[in-house]
Amino acid sequence: MRVVILGSGVVGVASAWYLAKAGHEVTVIDRQPGPAMETSAANAGQISPGYAAPWAAPGVPLKAVKWMFQRHAPLAVRLDGSSFQLSWMWQMLKNCNTEHYMTNKGRMVRLAEYSRDCIKALRQETGIQYEGRQGGTLQLFRTQQQFESAAKDIAVLEDAGVPYKLLEASQLASVEPALAQVAHKLTGGLQLPNDETGDCQLFTQQLAKLAQQAGVTFLYNRSVDRLLVEGDKISGVQCGGEIFKADSYVVAFGSYSTALLRDLVSIPVYPLKGYSLTIPITDESAAPFSTVLDETYKIAITRFDQRIRVGGMAEIVGFNTQLEQKRRETLEMVVRDLYPNGGRVEDATFWTGLRPMTPDGTPIVGKTSLKNLFLNTGHGTLGWTMACGSGQLLSDLISGITPAIPSDDLGVARYSAGFRSLYTGPLNDVHPAR
């Protein structure tokens, strides 16, 4: 079967890899000159299934009001007056209750855990190198309330069979030695020892090379104008004067998926702006060993080989990609507070990107009302974490193979009135990755 994939970020390239492995003839189209040059370029570097959780959570509306008056707030909103922004925010607010939070987190953890199995199998099969580490993730708490509130997430982790360790402040240095100097600022942490880290852009570039060797065609520097429709099917993709035809089509356009699908499929995918710093390491003993996540500021600090990646924050500001100095100051403040001697912050590279976010936090992976159109988008801040699992899942659905995980509640149909998931089993109902 011929398959055209729109988008060469980590999700699009992973989709291409698994579809090619399944025997399909795959073409990837992207406006950039190479893979992973937008949202996948400089993210926080975490592969953290256990921390897969929606931003829409109980208490977030009240916190958002408080954050409006804080200098280093993890979330900021700038109203643009568009009906889409207001509608998306309203849908997100409706998900900010315990029932929806637990349902959405369960879906996200299910896909994220499966995705980690997939990337592990991919590593074993190909030997792909991307400055990856399997040292776990440590969530840091600065208040006693945060420490005690971890019980809610621990319940989900236990249901999903995810190993964890709840650590007091005095135990943090056993996981992250450099934190010994700042333990007095912290109340404890939640470690997930099975989580991983790695350079998402490097991974995507290397996987694109492997996919090309497997027969995938990459067409760069081509802007997609529109999808052509005949009846209940897509008949082609128009890029300027060129039209590309296939048997099936995959939209992995990230935040730009919504606009491309306008008048065809309604999806609530909105750009959530984030930032990162990439800092050269000057003292390895004073740098992080793996990844820490500052719960107060929602900032992740990740170790690559000779670099530290500091990433996070969320701005609901539309497609604004301007670098804001005050956001850099927040990233610098957090890394200097926790790892003051790890690297030269003044030499850091500052970056921003748009994460494709759904109001319930769960990505949209699967079929649409158009028979040969599939979606793989809306992964929010977890595109790197979920990419391989989403790619394998999508390949199975297109190939007519029963997926290894329940997936009916991951598709766009869940936004339809009256939708009820067929899946009612435990979160860890996962078959081994192929």
UniProtKB/Swiss-Prot annotation:
Question: Which GO BP terms sit in this record?
Answer: D-alanine catabolic process
> What is this enzyme's EC?
1.4.99.-
Which cofactors does it use?
FAD
Q: What class of enzyme is it?
A: oxidoreductase
Keywords for this protein: FAD, Flavoprotein, Oxidoreductase
Among InterPro entries, the record links this protein to:
DadA (IPR023080), FAD-dep_OxRdtase (IPR006076), FAD/NAD-bd_sf (IPR036188)
MF annotations from Gene Ontology: D-amino-acid dehydrogenase activity
Annotated FAD binding lies at 3-17
Show the SUPFAM superfamilies listed in the entry.
Answer: FAD-linked reductases, C-terminal domain (SSF54373), FAD/NAD(P)-binding domain (SSF51905)
Q: Does the keyword Flavoprotein apply?
A: yes
Catalytic activity, reaction form: a D-alpha-amino acid + A + H2O = a 2-oxocarboxylate + AH2 + NH4(+)
Family note: Belongs to the DadA oxidoreductase family.
Q: Which NCBIfam families match?
A: PRK00711.1
- Name of the protein described by the UniProt record: D-amino acid dehydrogenase
